[in-house]
A protein has these predicted regions:
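Bacterial N-terminal signal peptides
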Residues: 5-16
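A beta-strand edge to alpha-helix "cap/lid" segment located at domain peripheries
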Residues: 21-148
Length: 148
């Protein structure tokens, strides 16, 4: 009986330790992804293609607010630039080496960009994957929130 009780106590204790480590790992991943998600928005704002190439995978795709699926061609060519880009990650879902981030964005396009000078509110979803030990943005979707 004592052996059974000891086994139960040890099992509960070990399970608690493993869960604690898992929670710490998940918290660290979430913190890293939130940092990268905001860094991505900052690189887009600055038009920093070198930084974006370190964030995006080679096969990165975006379902953009212009109803197109592309490789961020509008950003790469400078057809879309921003005076302001605020991103607020609201939900981070961790599934192994894949993380899905959902939230809202407020952007103000500039120059010859469509809707230049207007404040545009959007919802977004970013999909991050760990590749070769680094978190990279593999896909993104952004939709303009209808104005009333």
């Amino acid at each position: 009986m004592r052996l059974i009780m000891l086994a139960v106590v040890l099992t509960i204790s070990i399970t608690g330790l493993v869960s604690g480590q898992s929670a710490k790992q998940r918290a660290a991943i979430e913190q890293e992804i939130r940092r990268l998600d905001v860094a991505h928005a900052d690189a887009v704002l600055r038009g920093d293609l070198a930084a974006l190439d370190k964030i995006w995978t080679r096969d990165f795709k975006v379902n953009n607010p212009f109803n197109e699926i592309d490789k961020a061609d509008r950003i790469r060519t400078g057809a879309v630039t921003y005076a302001s880009f605020i991103r607020v990650p609201e939900s981070v879902l961790i599934h192994g080496d894949t993380v899905i981030v959902m939230g809202r964005e407020e952007v103000v396009p500039k120059g010859n960009s469509p809707d230049a000078g207007k404040t545009i509110n959007r919802r977004y979803t970013n999909i991050w994957m760990k590749r070769s030990g680094k978190w990279r943005l593999i896909a993104r979707q952004a939709s303009v929130i209808c104005q009333k």
